Amino acid sequence: MNNNELVSVIIPVYNSEKYLEECLESIINQTYPNIEIIAVDDGSEDSSLDILEQYSNKIDVYSQQNQGLASSLNLGISNVKGNWLKWFSPDDVMFPNTIETLVTEAKKYDDNTIIYSNWNIINDSGESLREFQESNYNELSAFDFNIRLLDGQQINVNTTLIPINLLEKCKIRKLDDPVAIDYDLFLQCAIQHEAKFHLIMNPLIKYRIHTGQLSHKNITKTMEYVEKIRDEFILQLDDSLQKKYFNELQLYQKTKTTKRKTMELGMKLISSTPSYVSDRILTFYLNKLRQNR
């Protein structure tokens, strides 16, 4: 293997001591042999940096004063050597064959295609709650997929494998709401650089949801911010494309009344139930949203 088959995994770390070792071990023990792991500690106040340094013979460790997620990612990206990038959360866990499966699929497509997958949801203790199934848009045209993306279709960035050449064209931007950084990146790739997206139906990661992580207030705030980013992107297009996207988006959204009713119900359930059951309700709610797309 050569660097054309090297996968660069970037882990932005901030106060992640509780799950960090489990995350690192899941990456180090991948069946795919050609991986570089780059961890960037963003001024953690716990033992995260100490844990990273214990793995310094297996991973590249960088540290900086607290500057936020975008800065950590950009520092990591500036040091990658691989042909593909995998951005991964220090709370989450890969299956042993995650990267091998992603690379095998990526080789079937051009270097302008982002590969992503379904994922399993786990709780604080690592207990599996259920599989989260992404809507399968593999047969859609790039334009129709972009409409879904502009409508707020979320792709779990932790499942993705991104060609490095796309990240040479796009920017990880510092945003007021860091939760939207990945959505902003995907819009850049899709709308500005005509990237395509391909879904693997198998779950390839364990995505950890923390008790109290999401709330009605936070979900509403993020959704509003996502809509702001979307409108900014459309307004950057030439007049004919602006009109085409706005018209198609409005037409698509007219069919979404069922989805929006489900969303409102889901938010009420999350905000009105005790935190110890919210995770389970959330998984049901998330899948209901996807079923109504």
Feature annotation, model-predicted:
Residues 26, 41-50, 67, 89:
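A conserved acidic beta->alpha catalytic loop
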Residues 85:
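Short aromatic/hydrophobic "clamp" motif used to bind/position activated sugar donors
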Residues 1-28:
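N-proximal low-complexity "stem/linker" segments adjacent to membrane-targeting elements
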Residues 177, 184, 191, 197, ...:
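C-terminal subregions of glycosyltransferases and related glycan-biosynthesis enzymes
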Residues 97-130:
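Conserved donor NDP-sugar-binding/catalytic core segment of glycosyltransferases
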Residues 18-21, 44-54, 93, 97:
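Acidic helix N-cap motif at the loop->helix transition within catalytic regions
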Residues 64-80, 101:
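Glycine-rich, basic loop-to-helix element that forms the pyrophosphate-binding segment
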Residues 78, 137-221, 225-226:
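Conserved nucleotide-sugar donor-binding catalytic segment
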